[in-house]
Amino acid sequence: MPTKALGETLNEYVVVGRKIPTEKEPVTPIWKMQIFATNHVIAKSRFWYFVSMLRRVKKANGEILSIKQVFEKNPGTVKNYGVWLKYDSRTGHHNMYREYRDTTVAGAVTQCYRDMGARHRAQADRIHILKVQTVKAEDTKRAGIKMFHDAKIRFPLPHRVTKRKNLSVFTTARQNTHFA
């Protein structure tokens, strides 16, 4: 299932659906879910996947009332996000909490999918995002996120290779790339 972002960030959708009313059950409960997907078609598909697992209702016996893409209110500021997830690996089910810094919730979740694929070889359709929440700077737990909260943060000079134009491709001396 193409849950992963193919080059771009995932979008955040709020999908609202319910079981189709019947004579036996004229008033049915409404379910609302926050889904991260590349487009609205995949968001609907993931909605029915989760509803069939949680409420035992198939797509044939249900209907989607609304689907809306959610946009970040102020995407210009960097925030800390905590992501609670569960995923299935070759050995079993795992629960996990991860932290990311990003400007949007969808960007943080995209980072999470890519990070889980890289570190744990978890496939995108086996990852279930349970909750995403902004985390205050003093409440962050991970050292990789805490190091960016220093006001006097300094970044090292990068290890650059300068491209000189009028030089031959092959040379007898190795170039110096350390500029410290």
Swiss-Prot record:
Gene Ontology biological process terms from the UniProt entry: cytoplasmic translation
SUPFAM superfamilies named among the record's database cross-references: RplX-like
Pfam families per UniProt: Ribosomal_L18A
InterPro entries attached to this UniProt entry: Ribosomal_eL20 (IPR028877), Ribosomal_eL20_dom (IPR023573), Ribosomal_eL20_eukaryotes (IPR021138)
GO MF entry, a single one: structural constituent of ribosome
GO CC terms, sorted: cytosolic large ribosomal subunit
Keywords: Ribonucleoprotein, Ribosomal protein
Domain of life the protein comes from: Eukaryota
HAMAP family assigned to the protein according to its UniProt record, in alphabetical order: Ribosomal_eL20 (MF_00273)
Family classification: Belongs to the eukaryotic ribosomal protein eL20 family.
Protein name per UniProt: Large ribosomal subunit protein eL20
